[in-house]
């Protein structure tokens, strides 16, 4: 059983300075003040309520005890650090954001990119994933962006971070816009961030396949309520520990590699402020 360390004084300092205490050894669970911190409140309630995206392929599927995926492991990592159970609830990006804002969820993993605009509405952790806009080919003749000429394409891109097909290949054929790529009609290719595209792929299949160059870079982090930045910072420390101790790479191997065939790359080292600065507020 993990050992608990009573840190009432540390919690007072935490509230006053908005600093996260040092990450303890793996066999230690810090006991936080339930009045001063969300970490302590979660410990008092005995459960961390985590929102995960619906049908997100290797990133999240199912809910409750049936939840599986990369973000599910991240949620378990945070719950384990607090010594509590975890309750996974699935929803659309909009539903997850609303549940965070209402206090129904403590933490959520909506597929919402980190931008300077986004961090004015919610607190985010450092990125657990750096996505790239890519082309997902269903047609062996589509091997790069230039090959989209005359092809039918479905795109799912963010208004701020995405680059539309019309700019990438002005000669593309019919282009359909879909918030959910699963709702796309039959097409030759899809365009969007890889964090969304991977849900359309299956282990072992030659097609569809990610092709061509990476178009951009976008950070994705876990979300908390805007006023709960201290908790978001605490969660970032748990993600950092998972990266340095090899668990991030292990989860990549368990969930992402079977779909893409890629070996685990270096974990993301980008901080929240760096990710947001890639997409500044309009002046």
PLM feature spans:
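Flexible hinge/capping segments at coil-to-helix
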Residues: 126, 137-153, 233
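Extracytoplasmic small-molecule ligand-binding "clamshell" domains
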Residues: 27-111
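Short loop->beta-strand "edge-of-pocket" segments that line small-molecule binding or catalytic clefts
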Residues: 48-52, 145-163
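Periplasmic-binding protein-like
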Residues: 54, 129-139, 198, 202-240, ...
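A ligand-binding cleft/hinge motif common to bilobed small-molecule-binding domains
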Residues: 111-120, 164-166, 183-217
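C-terminal motif of bacterial Sec signal peptides marking the signal peptidase cleavage site
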Residues: 13-18
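Short helix-initiation/N-cap motifs at beta->coil->alpha
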Residues: 35, 87-98, 140, 170-186, ...
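Ligand-binding clefts/hinges and TM-proximal coupling segments of bilobed small-molecule sensing domains
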Residues: 21-33, 162-178, 240-283
